[in-house]
C-alpha cells in the first residue's frame, strides 16, 4: 500500500526539520509528528495555497502529489510498490518506487508482505538523496 510507516516519516522529519520549515497537514485520524508545524484547522484550499508557496512537497503518492504537479512544484513522492509512477506519476517529480517481481501489487485493504518489504528497502537515506536532488534541480 501507500503507507511508508509512521516511524519512517518520524525519522525523515527529524533529519530535515532543523534546516527546513516542515508543515504537516492533518485530519482527525492523523498521527502528529512532534516538533513540526501541524495546524489543527487547514482546509484543502489553504493547504494548496501553502503548497504553492513551498519549495518542495514530500509525502505519499496521492492527492497532494497531484496538487504539486498542477502547481508545477517539485515533489518527492513515496509510491512503495503499490502502483508504478509510470502509470500515475510525473516525470518532473522524484518518485520513489519499490520495483520487484511483485510490483505493483495494488493491495489496498492490508499491508502485504511485498509492501512490508518496500517499507524496509526504501530507507530514510534514499528519501534524503531524492530530496537533495529535487532541491538542486
Where would I find each of the regions flagged by the language model?
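A generic structural signal for short coil/turn motifs at secondary-structure boundaries
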Residues: 1-3, 118
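Donor-binding and catalytic core of enzymes assembling or modifying cell-surface/extracellular glycoconjugates
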Residues: 3-81
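Nucleotide-sugar donor-binding patch of glycosyltransferase catalytic domains
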Residues: 69-137
